């Protein structure tokens, strides 16, 4: 009877140890996965910074901003003029009833 109890106890301990080892292995694989993810993101960021330092990309960005400024400047000036005219019309409408 004691031998049977010792055998059951030994098998239980071995199975629990095996489960503990598997659980630790799963945690390590999760840590490894997260570590690889952060390493990939870091490498991608470094590559992006190196590409942004290139003169070709800077020249493209400068040309884009200049083109945008050329297209938007007349629109902004026209919008400003229209706004001033609109406000002047309100001022004239308020001034007319007061003089009558």
Curated annotation (Swiss-Prot):
The keyword Secreted applies. Residues 1-18 form the signal peptide. It is found in: Secreted. One of its GO terms (cellular component) is spherical high-density lipoprotein particle. The keyword Nucleus does not apply. Keywords: Cleavage on pair of basic residues, HDL, Lipid transport, Secreted, Signal, Transport. GO terms for biological process: cholesterol homeostasis; cholesterol transport; lipoprotein metabolic process; positive regulation of phagocytosis; protein stabilization. Plasma. InterPro entries: ApoA-II (IPR006801), ApoA-II_sf (IPR036172). Pfam families: ApoA-II (PF04711). GO terms for molecular function: cholesterol transfer activity; high-density lipoprotein particle binding; lipid binding. May stabilize HDL (high density lipoprotein) structure by its association with lipids, and affect the HDL metabolism. Belongs to the apolipoprotein A2 family. Monomer. Interacts with NAXE and NDRG1. This is Apolipoprotein A-II. It comes from Panthera tigris altaica (Siberian tiger).
């Amino acid at each position: 009877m004691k031998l049977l109890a010792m055998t059951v106890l030994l098998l239980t301990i071995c199975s629990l140890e095996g489960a503990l080892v598997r659980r630790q292995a799963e945690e390590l694989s999760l840590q490894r996965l997260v570590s690889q993810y952060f390493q990939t993101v870091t490498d991608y960021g470094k590559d992006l910074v190196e590409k942004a330092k290139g003169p070709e990309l800077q020249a493209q960005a400068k040309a884009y901003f200049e083109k945008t400024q050329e297209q938007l400047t007349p629109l902004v000036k026209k919008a400003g003029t229209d706004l001033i005219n609109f406000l002047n019309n309100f001022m004239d409408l308020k001034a007319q009833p007061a003089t009558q």
